[in-house]
Each structure stands twice: as structure tokens, then as C-alpha cells.
């Protein structure tokens, strides 16, 4: 074989290797940038902000921060003697007006029986008016008593659901105002994932598609199902000025950043029992209508999936 032929073969092999490398790089780039996945995903859960409905001194806090509590379990207690005294006073008012109403009822009935032969019509009407006034006062006293009873019941703040108390920032002896958040309750078995997918990766993603969730720093893979895709996000390029006219930011036409859209993913029931707090980060891969079988994937595909954790 001549020297010229060997050069042609070497050049052909080199070009073929370069072409294969370009194709491989393009495939990897397309797989990495266009397939529906994101490293910007967060564990999320239903959180209840616990705030008292009454004001007063906190007398007891029988729970600890980050403790798992049951529904109805006492979280903290507010100054009960003060509200017990208010209820006793309200009950005394009710008893007083009940007695007064009964007395005025007898007096009005007696005057009605005697009639205008024994007294004037004006006196009869006045007696009826006094009776109606006392009845209204009794109704008001009953309402005040019921409210005092409700306030006393709400001096004991209980967990509205099973979950973990967190960010407990109240202690016995402190004064707390009505409506002031005292602790957050992370409800158990309500965890889900919010995956912020780029808009270029949303095509083909539908509710019901399966998803793989890999927590940051872990090799464990959780599974879930796409629940919904957000119907809208804030338009950061547009706002209104003081006169209501639209203000549009200037953008470079050749640089367009893809907007991220929240995709809600329900965790499978068996994966609800995990140790990852709400707010922690995860990588999410949408696998389509079925779960991906890791045993059938080629080493290159496995490497690509693993590279997502680092890129």
C-alpha cells in the first residue's frame, strides 16, 4: 500500500472519529439540556402557622421544638385563671338577668290581668317595654357568657393535625398577643415536590407522568407523579408606573433566559416516610408515563443521569 493511500486512510479515520465525537457531544448536550429535568427542586409540605385566638401570659409549653405531635395534643396554655374569672362574671350576669326577666314577666302578667280598670294603659305599656329591655339584656349577657366560654377553651392551644412542631419560639412566662404566630406545624404525610422546570423543558410534561426525585447529597431515589403545572408566574420584565402605564425592561435580543415554571409532584405513599425536611433541595427527572428501569439503561445513560447531579 502506497504512502498516499495510508495518508488518505489516516485522514478518513481521523475525520470519522471527529464526526463520531461531534455526534456524541451533540447527543449528550441535547440529553442534558432538553430532557425534562431540573436540579432546582424543593421538598415542600403543608405548614400551619399556629397562633392563639386570645392574649395573655403563657403558663405552660409541654412540647419541644421539632417534636412529632398528634392531632389535638396540647401545644401551649395561656393564662386560664383570668379567663375563668371572666366566665364566672359572665355567668353571674346571666343569672342576674334571668332572675330579673322572670320578675318583670310576672309583673307584666299581673298588670295585663288587672287591665285598664286598675291602672292606665301607659303603665301597662311601660311594664311591657321594661320586660322587653330586660330580655334583650339577658340575650346580650348570654352572648357574652358564650364568648367568655369560647375564650377559656381557646386558652389551650392544640395541634390541628398530626405533624412536627418547628421554630417554637415561645416559653412559659412570656406574654403573647392574639394572632401572633407562636410555632409552625409541618403536617405529616403532606410532603410533595416543587420542581422548577425551565420553560424549554415543559413540552410533553403532563399531569400523571412519573418522576424520579434524588435528594441533594443522597443516592436514594424517591418516586412521584406529576400533579399539576403552574398556570402562571410573575412577569419580572413588566411593571406599572405611578400613572398605571406599563414599564418594560430592556432585554438583549440574543440573550434570552428561560423562565422557570413550578411543577407540583406528589410523592408516592411509600416515599412519604423520609427524613428530608421541607425546603431542602433535590434533583427531579420526569421519566414519562412509566418509571425508568435502571437495570435496562446503558452505562452511558447511567453516566448522563449521574452527571445531572453535578452540572
Curated annotation (Swiss-Prot):
Q: Which residues cross the membrane?
A: 11-31
- Membrane topology classification: Single-pass membrane protein
Q: Do you know which SUPFAM superfamilies this protein is assigned to?
A: HlyD-like secretion proteins
* Main localization category: membrane
Q: Which GO terms of the molecular function aspect are on file?
A: transmembrane transporter activity
The UniProt keyword set, sorted, is: Cell inner membrane, Cell membrane, Membrane, Transmembrane, Transmembrane helix, Transport
Report the superkingdom from the record: Bacteria
Keyword Transcription regulation listed? The answer is no
Q: Name one GO cellular component term.
A: plasma membrane
The record's section on Pfam families has: CusB_dom_1 (PF00529), HlyD_D23 (PF16576)
InterPro entries in the record: CusB-like_dom_1, CusB_D23, MFP_Efflux_Pump, PHBA_efflux_pump_AaeA, RND_pump_MFP
Does the record carry Cell membrane as a key word?
yes
Localisation per UniProt entry: Cell inner membrane
The UniProt family comment states:
Belongs to the membrane fusion protein (MFP) (TC 8.A.1) family.
Q: Which NCBIfam families match?
A: PRK10559.1 (NF007850), RND_mfp (TIGR01730)
What function does this protein fulfil? Forms an efflux pump with AaeB.
* Name of this chain's protein: p-hydroxybenzoic acid efflux pump subunit AaeA
Amino acid at each position: 500500500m502506497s504512502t498516499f493511500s495510508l495518508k488518505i486512510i489516516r485522514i478518513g479515520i481521523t475525520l470519522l472519529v471527529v464526526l463520531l465525537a461531534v455526534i456524541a457531544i451533540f447527543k449528550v448536550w441535547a440529553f442534558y439540556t432538553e430532557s425534562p429535568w431540573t436540579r432546582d427542586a424543593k421538598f415542600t409540605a403543608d405548614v400551619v402557622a399556629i397562633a392563639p385566638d386570645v392574649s395573655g401570659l403563657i403558663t405552660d409549653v409541654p412540647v419541644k421544638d421539632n417534636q412529632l405531635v398528634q392531632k389535638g395534643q396540647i401545644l401551649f396554655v395561656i393564662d386560664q385563671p383570668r379567663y375563668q374569672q371572666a366566665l364566672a362574671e359572665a355567668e353571674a350576669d346571666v343569672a342576674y338577668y334571668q332572675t330579673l326577666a322572670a320578675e318583670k314577666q310576672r309583673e307584666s302578667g299581673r298588670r295585663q290581668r288587672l287591665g285598664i280598670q286598675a291602672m292606665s294603659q301607659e303603665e301597662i305599656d311601660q311594664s311591657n317595654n321594661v320586660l322587653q329591655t330586660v330580655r334583650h339584656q339577658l340575650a346580650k349577657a348570654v352572648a357574652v357568657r358564650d364568648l367568655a366560654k369560647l375564650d377559656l377553651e381557646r386558652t389551650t392551644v392544640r395541634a390541628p393535625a398530626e405533624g412536627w412542631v418547628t421554630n417554637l419560639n415561645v416559653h412559659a412566662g412570656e406574654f403573647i398577643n392574639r394572632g401572633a404566630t407562636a410555632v409552625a406545624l409541618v403536617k405529616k404525610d403532606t410532603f410533595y415536590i416543587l420542581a422548577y422546570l425551565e420553560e424549554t423543558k415543559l413540552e410533553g410534561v403532563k399531569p400523571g407522568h412519573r418522576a424520579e426525585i434524588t435528594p441533594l447529597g443522597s443516592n436514594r431515589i424517591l418516586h412521584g407523579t406529576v400533579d399539576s403545572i403552574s398556570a402562571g408566574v410573575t412577569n419580572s420584565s413588566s411593571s406599572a408606573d405611578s400613572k398605571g402605564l406599563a414599564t418594560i425592561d430592556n432585554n438583549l435580543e440574543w440573550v434570552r433566559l428561560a423562565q422557570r415554571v413550578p411543577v407540583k409532584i406528589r410523592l408516592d405513599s411509600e416515599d412519604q416516610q423520609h427524613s428530608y425536611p421541607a425546603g431542602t433541595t433535590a434533583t427531579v427527572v420526569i421519566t414519562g408515563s412509566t418509571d425508568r428501569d435502571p437495570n435496562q439503561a446503558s452505562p452511558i445513560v447511567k453516566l448522563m443521569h449521574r452527571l445531572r447531579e453535578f452540572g
